[in-house]
């Protein structure tokens, strides 16, 4: 089951986005993820081809790096 989650974040720059993406990859290497920092919501898009996206983990990683996120519906 393929799942895609899109998160609104307050990540503002490419360096911070890179750090967060690397940390997500360390915890969940099967996730395909990217940021769209041009979007007004500073979107983080995550795809998991083998199940659900662990939103709790994503929130924890964002918060650990002093950022916030919310799932876009």
Predicted regions and their residues:
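Short glycine-/aliphatic-rich beta-strand segments at the starts of folded cytosolic domains
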Residues: 1-11
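Short amphipathic alpha-helix segments
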Residues: 12-28
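Short loop or secondary-structure boundary microenvironments that flank
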Residues: 10-13, 48
């Amino acid at each position: 089951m393929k799942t895609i989650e899109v998160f609104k974040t307050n990540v503002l720059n490419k360096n911070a986005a890179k750090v967060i993406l690397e940390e997500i990859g360390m915890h969940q290497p099967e996730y395909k993820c990217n940021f769209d920092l041009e979007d007004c919501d500073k979107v983080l898009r995550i795809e998991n081809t083998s199940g659900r996206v662990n939103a709790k983990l994503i929130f924890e990683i964002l918060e650990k790096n002093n950022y916030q996120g919310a799932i876009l519906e």
